[in-house]
Structures are given as structure tokens and as C-alpha cells.
Amino acid sequence: MVEKKSAKRNRREEILQALAQMLESSDGSQRITTAKLAANVGVSEAALYRHFPSKTKMFDSLIEFIEDSLITRINLILKDEKETMPRLRLITQLILGFGELNPGLTRILTGHALMFEQDRLQGRINQLFERIELQIRQVMRERKMREGEGFATDEALLATQLLAFCEGLLSRFVRSEFRYRPTVDFDARWPLMAAQLI
């Protein structure tokens, strides 16, 4: 019984990895059909549906992985780092680094891969970015309490600016077919971004 559950979980992971790899390849710039995905995994479409009731559920699982990865790591940053600007830098690096390491998932983050899918999926990505923006805003608001001085500009505006910076570099990464990595020149870019915040 345990072996059967483990095999099912492994097949589910194999399907999700294949979908992420297809999103990373040139196939990712087009609608990915279950027929193409099944052929890529080496199973029938019926076998796909034994593991996932729909392609939407496959995307849901990938989005859940993205959410868990980013939110868990942001929480670790907040636990380990107490100063505001290093926190913001680490969160920014995390988002850009995650995108760079997971090009197929970056197509989901930018909404590119979801153009052909249910609107609800784009709503989940929107909610994820809203959660991250809320975390960034909270980090900025805590600055006055932790360090004795706040920001000169409204934290909501600054949080939006920082997230737009991340989204812009991720979009460029996708648009360039993953040639322009979002973390390249980060050490030179961050002081420019930080200067806008302070």
C-alpha cells in the first residue's frame, strides 16, 4: 500500500516536472496540451487524469510549489535578518533568484504561461504577489520601530516600486527566452533601487 502511494506521488512529481520543463522550452511559449504533456512524460492522457483531474490542477500544484517556496523563504529571511535594508535586499534576491533557477515557473509568475488557461490561475498569482507586497510593506513599516527612523515616502508606494522592479526583471527574462538572467548585475542594480527607497 505504501509502495503504491509512493509510486503515485512519484508519477505526480514526474508530471509536474515535465510540465515545468515544457514551460521552460520553446513549447512554453504556446498552449501546452495534455496530449503533448502525456507524450513528454511517456504515458497516455488517461494516465495523466488518474493523477490530476485537469490541467488546471497541474498548474495549481505548480503555483502551490511557487507559493510555498517563496513565502517559506521570506519568513526565514525575516526570522534571521533584523535590519530593514538587508531584509529588502534578500527578499528581492530571493524572488529574482527563484525565477532564474526555475525558468518554466517564471512563465507562470509572469502570467505568460497562464494566458491560455483559466482566469482563476492568474488570480492565484495575483494573490501571491499581493502577499509578497504586503510582507515588504510590513518590513518597511517596522523600520521606524526597529531602527528609529521610517521612510520619507509612503511604504505602500515603495513596496509597489520594489515589486515592480522584480516583476520587470522576471518579464525581461521570459521575453528574452531566458537569456537575460534577472540576477546579473544585481550588486550594481541594488544600490540604485535602494536609493529610490531611502
Swiss-Prot record:
NCBIfam families, per database record: PRK09480.1 (NF007015)
Compartmental location: Cytoplasm, Nucleoid
Annotated keywords: Cell cycle, Cell division, Coiled coil, Cytoplasm, DNA-binding
GO terms for cellular component: bacterial nucleoid; cytoplasm
Name of the encoding gene: slmA
Free-text function comment from the UniProt entry: Required for nucleoid occlusion (NO) phenomenon, which prevents Z-ring formation and cell division over the nucleoid. Acts as a DNA-associated cell division inhibitor that binds simultaneously chromosomal DNA and FtsZ, and disrupts the assembly of FtsZ polymers. SlmA-DNA-binding sequences (SBS) are dispersed on non-Ter regions of the chromosome, preventing FtsZ polymerization at these regions.
Ranges annotated as DNA-binding: 33-52
Pfam families on file: SlmA-like_C, TetR_N
Recorded superkingdom: Bacteria
Name recorded for this polypeptide: Nucleoid occlusion factor SlmA
GO biological process, alphabetically ordered: cell division; negative regulation of division septum assembly
Lineage: Bacteria, Pseudomonadati, Pseudomonadota, Gammaproteobacteria, Enterobacterales
InterPro entries tied to this protein: DNA-bd_HTH_TetR-type_CS (IPR023772), Homeodomain-like_sf (IPR009057), HTH-type_TetR-like_transc_reg (IPR050109), HTH_TetR (IPR001647), NO_SlmA (IPR023769), SlmA-like_C (IPR054580)
Organism the protein comes from: Erwinia tasmaniensis (strain DSM 17950 / CFBP 7177 / CIP 109463 / NCPPB 4357 / Et1/99)
